[in-house]
Every structure is written in structure tokens, then in C-alpha cells.
Regions:
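Long, hydrophobic alpha/beta structural blocks
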Residues: 1-4, 9-17, 21-25, 29-281
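C-terminal structured domains
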Residues: 243-336
Length: 336
């Protein structure tokens, strides 16, 4: 999938003796091949991180002004990326000053389009010391961007925001006391909705099992174990970690499942307490009409007790319990 970069800027946030200093760079950098690669790498690395939270802009724009800065940017023609990023840097500086654990770095801002949706990516990247070869086959120190090591990043789905979607901001969670300032810089309200988060996780797990081409017994086992893991967290009132879930549920290749759960387009909140009421679809099917209702476990399909005919949209049940059989025989004998 192509990231079409519209605008990009890089500024610096430096920590000096307990305070922070902002150094502005160019606010409308050229999209060179190198810049495209850097933004593509940041986007891909952000997408792979499992520990993310999602939310929407907080109501208090005076305390959390990023929304109004972004609104002004989108309403100005031509859009003023310089003003947006400068104001956001001041907000970042202010929020970082409130948190002792906050650090600085190179702050990347990228406005890009992906699959007909527009995003603003913000990432703080530091440098690390490496080595390179010289022309006479010696080694020398060289500093370069630590792309894999960034801890602070967020993405605003501007199209989702404009369309009134419920969740359009995502950011890396990390340790709460460290990442909290970045969340407040974005102005993100992350009110947790455990039942909704659980239902969305269930749908993602079911889709994963289908996409992996699991046969029916394997799919039943996978989803049943997922339910057991989630119920364990729910009973203990412990937050569910996607990384831990993937490692236990798919120990042979946890990366495949983690990649799905981390997909920012799914907007799955990592680190919520599962709601047991929303776990049923992992092992149950149910439905009703005005005249009847039905519920059965997945293993009923595996054992052949329930058969679905997709062509005529009918369901056949076998192995009916004796009490139900007796009631039906009595009912039909009266009719006869």
C-alpha cells in the first residue's frame, strides 16, 4: 500500500537541565526518495507495535489544543503546515515539561494519504551510534536515526475525524508515566469501553482463524483457547496484553497474530480488561426471529449435530434431547 506524502516537517525537542527547548526545522521539506523511505519505515514500524491505544479528541480544546490547530490547518487554503507544526511543538514542549520522565528527540510530522484516507503521523525519533567502513577499509563512528527504537508515536486519522468516527487517534502506550504526556499532547480521550473492545477483539480473532485457512477442528480449538485466555484475564480483572495473547495462543508463529492485532486500521485497544459477556461468539452461534430462537456451540457443527445448507438457507439439527422430542411428538400427534 502506497503512502502518498502531502507534507512533511522535522523539528527538534531538546531537554536541558529539566526544561525543554524547541528548534524549528524546515516545515515543508521536499519528499525525496530518502524521505519517502523514512516515512514509509516509520509508518510500517508503528503499525507493527502491538501496544497501542485509541480514542478521540478531548472536549477541552483550551487544555488540549491540538484539535483546533489541526482544524485551522485543514481550513486554510493553501494549508499552512508551518503554523500547524510550530503550534504542535509548543504543545508538545508544554506537556513534556509537566512529566519528569519525558525526553526529547527529532519530531517528525507527516501528512499523508493512504487508501483514500488522510493521516497525520507524529513520531519522536532519536539517534544512536553506529559504525561504517572507510575507503581504506577501516571503521569509523557514525550517528544515524534509531528507527526501530522510537517510543513515542501517534497517528490521527483525519478522514475518520471529519466523518465523525468514534476512534480516529492512535498512539503507542508504553509505560503509562512516560507515554501519558504524548497522549495529552495529542489531546486524546481514551475512555475504555471493555465490552466494545472485547467484541472487536473477538471479531479480529475469528477473521484471523478464517484467513489462516484453519480447518473446523483447528478453528474451534483456536477460538476456544482464546476464550479461556480472555476469561482468565476477566476473572482476575487484569489487562489483556496482545503480545502475551499471541505468544500463548499461537506459540509457533506469534508474529502473524500480533501483526493482525496491531493493525492500526482495526483500532484495537491493547491493555483492556475483557468483558466476559462479549466472549460468547468465540464458541457460540445464536439467533432469533419473532417466533423462535436458537443457540449452539461450535463443536455441534464439528460433531455433525448442526448442518447448514447455504443454498436454501436452512439449518438441520440432529440428536435432539428426549424431552424436546417428546414435546414435539405430542404436539404433532394432536395436530394429526
Amino acid at each position: 500500500v502506497t503512502n502518498t506524502i502531502i507534507r512533511v516537517a522535522i523539528h527538534d525537542l531538546t531537554k536541558t537541565q529539566g526544561s525543554f527547548v524547541v528548534k524549528h526545522g524546515k516545515s515543508d521539506l521536499k519528499v525525496t526518495q530518502t524521505m519517502q523511505r523514512v516515512i514509509d519505515d516509520l509508518t510500517a514500524l508503528y503499525a507493527k507495535r502491538t501496544s497501542k491505544s485509541y480514542g478521540k479528541f478531548a472536549v477541552d480544546e483550551d487544555r488540549f489544543p491540538t484539535e483546533k490547530h489541526l482544524r485551522a490547518y485543514l481550513n486554510v487554503q493553501p494549508s499552512d503546515f508551518t503554523t500547524l507544526t510550530h503550534k504542535m511543538m509548543e504543545t508538545l514542549k508544554a506537556q513534556a515539561s509537566y512529566k519528569g520522565a519525558a525526553t526529547g528527540g527529532h519530531v517528525f510530522f507527516a501528512h499523508f494519504e493512504r487508501e483514500e484516507r488522510q493521516y497525520l503521523l507524529i513520531a519522536i525519533v532519536n539517534e544512536k551510534l553506529g559504525a561504517s567502513m572507510t575507503s581504506d577499509l577501516d571503521v569509523q563512528d557514525v550517528r544515524h536515526l534509531d528507527m526501530d527504537g522510537f517510543r513515542f508515536a501517534g497517528r490521527i486519522n483525519m478522514t475518520g475525524w471529519a466523518n465523525g468516527e468514534e476512534r480516529y487517534i492512535g498512539f503507542l502506550k508504553g509505560k503509562r508515566e512516560v507515554s501519558e504526556y504524548f497522549m495529552e499532547f495529542l489531546g486524546c480521550d481514551t475512555t475504555v469501553q471493555n465490552r466494545r473492545d472485547t467484541a472487536e477483539l473477538v471479531q479480529a480473532l475469528m477473521a484471523f482463524a478464517t484467513d489462516e485457512g484453519m480447518d473446523t477442528p483447528s478453528k474451534d480449538d483456536f477460538l476456544a483457547r482464546a476464550k479461556t485466555i480472555c476469561e482468565r484475564s476477566a476473572k482476575a480483572q487484569e489487562e489483556l496484553s496482545f503480545e502475551a495473547l499471541a505468544n500463548e495462543l499461537s506459540p509457533q508463529d506469534p508474529e502473524r497474530l500480533m501483526t493482525v492485532l496491531a493493525d492500526p486500521d482495526l483500532r484495537l485497544n491493547d491493555g483492556f480488561v475483557p468483558d466476559r459477556r462479549a466472549l460468547g461468539p468465540l464458541i457460540k452461534f445464536k439467533g432469533k426471529t419473532p417466533t423462535w430462537s436458537i443457540e449452539f456451540n461450535r463443536d455441534a457443527i464439528t460433531r455433525g449435530n448442526v448442518r447448514f445448507n447455504a443454498e436454501d438457507n436452512t439449518l438441520t439439527l440432529t440428536g435432539l434431547p428426549e424431552d424436546l422430542t417428546a414435546q414435539l411428538r405430542a404436539e404433532y400427534s394432536q395436530d394429526g
